[in-house]
């Protein structure tokens, strides 16, 4: 499955405005149907979470978790997904972030 990145501020704002949100203690997920044949992934980590090293690590963990699980979880195509890290995600392991990502995708009902 192809996964592209959401990079532009306007694209993030569109997902926030029109999308539906799901949350747990570590992450928030916004989902918006983009009417394309691909999924697009955006990751946002606020400065409240920590310094740049911490924020970039969390971004990498979320992206890797989604990449490894997207085929396994059989996520449907045609969605914009934006993950927002909460302050509690600071210092969490890959396993905890991975479980959080899986949980949110299940909540959103994005299985084929």
Curated annotation (Swiss-Prot):
Gene Ontology biological-process entries: tRNA 5'-leader removal
Any Pfam family hit: Ribonuclease_P
Keywords, ordered alphabetically: Endonuclease, Hydrolase, Nuclease, RNA-binding, tRNA processing
InterPro entries the record matches: Ribosomal_Su5_D2-typ_SF (IPR020568), Ribsml_uS5_D2-typ_fold_subgr (IPR014721), RNase_P (IPR000100)
Catalytic activity entry: Endonucleolytic cleavage of RNA, removing 5'-extranucleotides from tRNA precursor
The protein's Enzyme Commission number: 3.1.26.5
Molecular functions (GO terms): 3'-tRNA processing endoribonuclease activity; ribonuclease P activity; tRNA binding
CC annotations in GO: ribonuclease P complex
Source domain of life: Bacteria
Protein purpose: RNaseP catalyzes the removal of the 5'-leader sequence from pre-tRNA to produce the mature 5'-terminus. It can also cleave other RNA substrates such as 4.5S RNA. The protein component plays an auxiliary but essential role in vivo by binding to the 5'-leader sequence and broadening the substrate specificity of the ribozyme.
Self-association and partners: Consists of a catalytic RNA component (M1 or rnpB) and a protein subunit.
Family note: Belongs to the RnpA family.
Protein name, as recorded: Ribonuclease P protein component
Native source organism of the sequence: Clostridium kluyveri (strain ATCC 8527 / DSM 555 / NBRC 12016 / NCIMB 10680 / K1)
This protein's encoding gene: rnpA
């Amino acid at each position: 499955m192809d996964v592209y990145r959401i990079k532009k501020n306007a694209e993030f704002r569109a997902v926030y405005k029109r999308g539906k949100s799901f949350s747990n203690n570590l992450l928030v997920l916004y989902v918006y149907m983009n009417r394309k044949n691909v999924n697009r992934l955006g990751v946002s980590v606020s400065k409240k979470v920590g310094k740049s090293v911490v924020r970039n690590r969390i971004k990498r963990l979320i992206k890797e978790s989604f990449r490894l699980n997207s085929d396994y979880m059989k996520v449907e195509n045609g969605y914009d997904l934006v993950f927002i890290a909460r302050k509690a995600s600071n210092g969490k392991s890959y396993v905890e972030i991975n479980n959080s990502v899986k949980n949110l995708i299940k909540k959103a009902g994005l299985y084929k």
